[in-house]
Design a protein with these regions (language model features):
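Alpha-helical interface subdomain recognition
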Residues: 1-80, 102, 117, 143-148, ...
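Short Ser/Thr-interspersed hydrophobic loop/turn segments at strand-loop and sheet-helix junctions
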Residues: 75-79, 170, 186-190, 213-217
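Glycine-rich phosphate/pyrophosphate-binding beta-alpha loops
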Residues: 80, 155-161, 201-202, 239-243
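N-terminal glycine-rich flavin-associated loop
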Residues: 83-105, 131-134
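A gly/ser-rich beta-alpha-beta helix-loop segment of oxidoreductase catalytic cores
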Residues: 120-143
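Flexible, small-/acidic-enriched active-site or ligand-binding loops
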Residues: 136, 189-218
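A short core secondary-structure module
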Residues: 151-194
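A short, charged helix-loop
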Residues: 208-235
Length: 321
């Protein structure tokens, strides 16, 4: 087990230490999982995370706020044990982030399902031409009576092809740049919705290109107000950017654990590698970088939890480091 002394930092409260202990026990009993069939593995992980009550932290009830420190602790711990487990948790939070922060009572029924692990979610923002440049989204949402008709494409969408519900960002008004964008909650079985292509990466996880062809959704599918899409997307990303750093921190802690184990067990000239001053220096540098990263990550999370409206600077620093 990695060093847990960082939990005594002033960023954390007793509930975070209790959460960390529960997570360690759950991970030891359930991870890693078989990655042979990635789709099946992700679905099984989401169901297991839901049964364990871990997905409760992926979204907030109406009137409550997300505990970003808890999100970071969960992502760090899961990533240290199994990267796919971290992915599965993170996508439930990111996918339903807009609903958690801005959704109507009707839309929040989906949040209950995703937090229970009974439905998978996805965040459909990135496009083939504009990438993640939200201001240049081209997918359109044309008002037609009581409905909106969506046309366009999204790509590199995590959980694409296996998600039950998607948050889709589209241009609903004739306005330039960030203005005129809206967010829609779209079930995967909506007519006109197509998984155009499944995408492969070096580290396998579900990714897809989506295509919308005259896809009709009711006005009640819109999340928040018309034209609020940019603000909604930035609010969601603002929360989850610091958690990206937390996942990387989990990978780094695992690397340090493995390094120390190897240096302790591997002998050269009749002595462990760990006795060599040069090796000790490298391990010390790793530990220093990990603590520096953790301080940046949990500073950002603590700042958000204490009421900051935006943590773009702090989260960007944490993610960069």
């Amino acid at each position: 087990m990695s060093d847990k002394s960082f939990l005594n930092w002033p960023f954390f409260e007793p509930r975070h230490r209790e959460l960390s202990a529960m997570l360690e026990a759950w991970c030891a009993a359930n991870l890693p999982v078989d990655h042979t069939d990635i789709d099946t593995a992700c679905k099984s992980l989401v169901a297991a995370l839901g049964r364990a009550g871990i997905l409760v932290h992926s979204g907030a009830d109406a009137g409550e706020t997300l505990d970003v420190r808890a999100l970071c602790l969960i992502r760090e711990t899961l990533a240290r044990h199994d990267g796919l487990a971290d992915f599965s948790f993170a996508m439930q939070g990111l996918g339903m982030g807009a609903v958690s922060l801005f959704g109507s009572a009707e839309q929040r029924d989906w949040l209950k399902k995703t937090r229970a692990g009974k439905a998978l979610s996805a965040f459909a923002l990135t496009e083939p031409a504009s990438g993640s440049d939200v201001a240049n989204i081209a997918t359109s949402a044309r008002k037609d009576g009581p409905d909106y008709i969506l046309n366009g494409e999204k790509t590199w969408i995590s959980n694409g092809g296996i998600a039950d519900i998607y948050v889709v960002f589209a241009r609903s008004e004739d306005a330039p740049g960030a203005k005129g964008l809206s967010a829609f909650l779209v079930p995967a079985d909506t007519p006109g919705f197509m998984i155009a292509e499944r995408l492969e990466t070096i580290a396998p996880h579900p990714l897809a290109r989506l295509k919308f062809t005259d896809m009709r959704v009711p006005a009640s599918a819109m999340i928040g107000e018309p034209g609020a899409g940019f603000r909604i997307s930035m609010s969601v990303l603002d929360v989850f950017r610091s958690t990206v750093g937390a996942a990387a921190l989990g990978f780094a802690r695992r690397a340090l654990d493995e390094t120390i184990k190897r240096a302790t067990n591997r002998e050269i000239g009749g002595k462990p590698l760990a006795d060599l001053q040069m090796v000790q220096g490298h391990i010390a540098d790793m530990a220093l970088d990990i603590d520096a990263a953790a301080l940046l990550i949990y500073r950002a999370a603590w700042t958000k939890d204490k009421g900051a409206v935006r943590i773009s600077r702090e989260a960007a620093m944490a993610k960069l480091y």
